Structure formats: structure tokens, C-alpha cells
Amino acid sequence: MEQEQDTPWTRSIEHINTQRRGNGQQTPKLEHPNSIQLMDHYPRITSRADMHKQIVCWKQWLSSKNPTQGSLKTHVLKRWKLFSKQEWTN
């Protein structure tokens, strides 16, 4: 079996640098957090913020007096178009 050569390419894939402890030993340390965890965390943050904005908007609308069927339909269509546009740009 061939041994994997230590090249700049393989080192960059591993994202490892060394850090000295107080006793002089070197330990490998990850340079960056796991990118999969980062990508998993980011949508959760943005979706919570978007959800909060939508809830606030609907509460404001519902607090208006005596909404009619027509105003409800108009409001829903405007919100849907805005939401769809944001989804495409993200």
C-alpha cells in the first residue's frame, strides 16, 4: 500500500495546526469549526429570525379592526410574493 504524502494540499484539507501546551507537548488543533455544523447552524438562525418577523407582521395585521375577506386575500398575496422573492434571492 502507498503511504499518503504530506503535501500542502493534504495539510490544507485537514485544517490542522499545532498548539504548544504548558509542558511543551504539541497537540493538533482544528483551525475552523466543522463546516457541516456551521452550515447546519446558519439556516436555524435565519429561519428563527424570519419566523419572528412573520409572526410580528401577522399579529399587527390581526390587531387591525374588522379585516374583510378582500383585505385578507390582498395581504396574503403580498406576503406570499415577498416571501417567494426572498427565497429565490437566498
Swiss-Prot record:
GO BP terms in the entry: symbiont-mediated perturbation of host apoptosis; symbiont-mediated suppression of host cytoplasmic pattern recognition receptor signaling pathway via inhibition of MAVS activity
Cellular component aspect of the GO annotation: host cell cytosol; host cell mitochondrial inner membrane; host cell nucleus; membrane
Pfam families: PB1-F2
Superkingdom, taxonomy of origin: Viruses
Ranges of biased composition (kind: Polar residues): 1-28
Subunit structure: Oligomer. Interacts with human SLC25A6/ANT3 and VDAC1. Interacts with host MAVS.
Function: Plays an important role in promoting lung pathology in both primary viral infection and secondary bacterial infection. Promotes alteration of mitochondrial morphology, dissipation of mitochondrial membrane potential, and cell death. Alternatively, inhibits the production of interferon in the infected cell at the level of host mitochondrial antiviral signaling MAVS. Its level of expression differs greatly depending on which cell type is infected, in a manner that is independent of the levels of expression of other viral proteins. Monocytic cells are more affected than epithelial cells.
HAMAP family reported in the protein's UniProt record: INFV_PB1F2
Other notes: Is not encoded in all strains, and seems to be dispensable for replication.
Family membership: Belongs to the influenza viruses PB1-F2 family.
Protein name: Protein PB1-F2
Native source organism of the sequence: Influenza A virus (strain A/Guinea fowl/Hong Kong/38/2002 H5N1 genotype X0)
Gene: PB1
